[in-house]
Amino acid sequence: HGAVDEMAHAETFHGYAPDLGYEFLRSAMAKNDYQAKGCDIKADEIFISDGAKEDCGNIQEIFSKDSKIAVCDPVYPVYVDTNVMAGRTGTYDAAAGTWSNVIYMPCTKETNFAPELPKETPDIIYLCFPNNPTGSTVTKEQLQTWVDYANKTGAVIIYDAAYEAYISEKEVPHSIYECEGARTCAIEIRSFSKNAGFTGVRLSATVIPKDIKSGDVMLHSLWARRHGTKFNGTSYIIQKAGEAVYSDAGKEQLSAQVAYYMNNAKVIKEGLKDAGYNVSGGVNAPYIWLETPKGMTSWDFFDYLLEKANV
């Protein structure tokens, strides 16, 4: 509340925030989220924004229009839809529900809902772990395979780590920068909504190491230019709240909140399993992924829940 009090007085009022983020929050993130886990990420490689959804949607603007994207299937819609809006995805096949210039990487029960390396080489690879919507994760060894692949092919990985606070298994990495070589191929996006409940407050970060290029272009400086051109910075009050997340009290409260959501997921998962459904997830993410019964499509099951079960 100290930041609110500061903003209430002319002598301590803060105007436009630094467009790339206040140093106090960038340093807190670098220290706690990365350096504490052995990741070589510095404060000036972290860009503060007002929501991971915005960052996931806006990051494609610094890439060429003819860049080809690869996405998991199923996928968080923002990755595809913003590229559609940018004119990058080709023509739409309504019957198949796919775009001609998008590489789809199936995530099925047979692959433990994790993607396999695509046969066609993409320019941009969207990965989200723990995954929205399936709740699946990959081990550090599996993620290293993707980093090696991206460095070999020249692709850039957009790594959505919004749900990293829910990871409970030691073999599951909290950041792609735990993998060797990730600084030269990966951009990571973090959210304060999923761990700290900033849903109506809005705060996020995009991490772009100074080593990463697309072709001959340094993406760190390009994103800094784009960010400064289109964004006037997240408010001082919100960024001070973000800094408080890394205090001892903040960490304790976050741990309790994550445990609450994971217990909800446990109750849902166990209830569905007891009812005879095949389900996964709920271990490193608050998502439960359910196999629809009797050959129903996802939309049929959704309508059934809405109209018959009142869910």
Describe each PLM feature range.
Residues 93-174:
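Active-site phosphate-binding strand-loop segment of PLP-dependent enzymes
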